[in-house]
A protein has these predicted regions:
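Short hinge/gating elements
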Residues: 24-33, 172-176, 198, 235
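Accessory alpha/beta interaction modules
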Residues: 1-168, 244
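Short, charged alpha-helical interaction segments and adjacent helix-coil junctions
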Residues: 2-18, 91-96, 184-285
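Short conserved micro-motifs at the rims of enzyme active sites and ligand-binding pockets
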Residues: 145-147, 181-185
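Conserved, well-folded catalytic cores of nucleic-acid-processing
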Residues: 48-51, 137, 175, 192-195, ...
Length: 285
């Protein structure tokens, strides 16, 4: 019933610039990799780099321009955005809404895939150049780190010496961000992903005047909005399915614990209290 109500509500919802989900996969690919949007993705990349005092770039060329037909056919590249800077550094960007510790391996795999693709067979290793991976996450990946933006490089442990600048992995954990994390350009972009009002963002960073125009173009396109809605539905039902599986897993574990306690002749009332199962459920085990 809830699923039906969600579908009906979302079908009739009027999409505006401010209620548009800025983390939607279709929208992000359009905003950051559609031809003509190079200045927008460049501003975001530079915001990430400035935040940790790395060099910035003057321009980028998008290597995987957004193509709606390919997107709908599932033939778009595995990373959301891939571009190259004026000094031949590759930047890959991915927005991930759900995940766990295995995302670290996934991001390493995507980085390695991009790095290895820089060389054709028999080409000299001197042709290799840095690959920067930027991962924007709508979940917490590193519970032991308070910072919402962390960056990993290849280092020698004893002397803390960086081996090479060819491997750089940025992780931006949106749930960790709060208004006290005011870090100029990057702060504005995080607010954007989290749904900040566009008029406020324009006051902080004039690139959002251009972003606002692209958002409106996206909304005005029926094919794009249809693809956007479809992605929203997919994410909703996937999340709902994962929640059900998680709840069923927890309940199965409770039954197993209760069964073991019952075999140890533990009082049924204590088993019920310990597991949250009713006494009737315990008796049936």
């Amino acid at each position: 019933m809830e699923e039906f109500e969600y579908l009906e509500k979302s079908k009739n919802e009027i999409i505006t610039i401010d209620n548009l989900n800025k983390k939607n996969d279709c929208f992000i690919r359009y905003l950051f990799s559609d031809e003509g949007n190079e200045n927008i993705v460049l501003d975001f990349i530079n915001g990430v780099m400035i935040d940790l005092n790395f060099q910035t770039f003057n321009n980028v060329v998008i290597l995987n321009p957004f193509n709606l037909t390919k997107y709908l056919d599932g033939k778009e590249s595995i990373v959301d955005v891939k571009c190259i800077t004026e000094d031949n550094q590759t930047v890959i960007i991915e927005i991930q809404l759900q995940g766990n510790q295995y995302f670290i391996r996934r991001s390493l795999y995507y980085w390695a895939n991009s790095y290895s693709s820089l060389l054709n067979k028999s080409e000299n290793y001197t042709k290799l150049s840095p690959v920067i991976s930027i991962n924007v996450l709508d979940f917490v990946l590193f519970n032991d780190i308070k910072d919402f933006h962390s960056c990993y490089l290849l280092k020698e442990i004893k002397h803390n010496k960086i081996l090479t600048d060819h491997c750089m992995l940025h992780y931006i954990e949106l749930p960790k961000f709060n208004l006290n994390n005011n870090k100029e350009k990057l702060s504005s972009w995080i607010k954007f992903f989290k749904g900040e009002n566009m008029s406020n963002l324009i006051k902080e960073n004039n690139i959002f005047e251009e972003v606002e125009k692209r958002c409106q173009s996206f909304i005005d396109s029926d094919p794009l909005i249809n693809a956007y809605r479809k992605k929203e539905w997919n994410e909703y039902f996937y999340k709902d399915m994962m929640n059900v599986e998680r709840e069923e897993g927890i309940k199965s574990e409770k039954y197993l614990i209760a069964k073991n306690l019952k075999q140890m002749n533990i009082d049924k009332a204590l088993i019920s209290k310990a597991t949250g199962l009713s006494i009737e459920e315990v008796e049936k085990l």
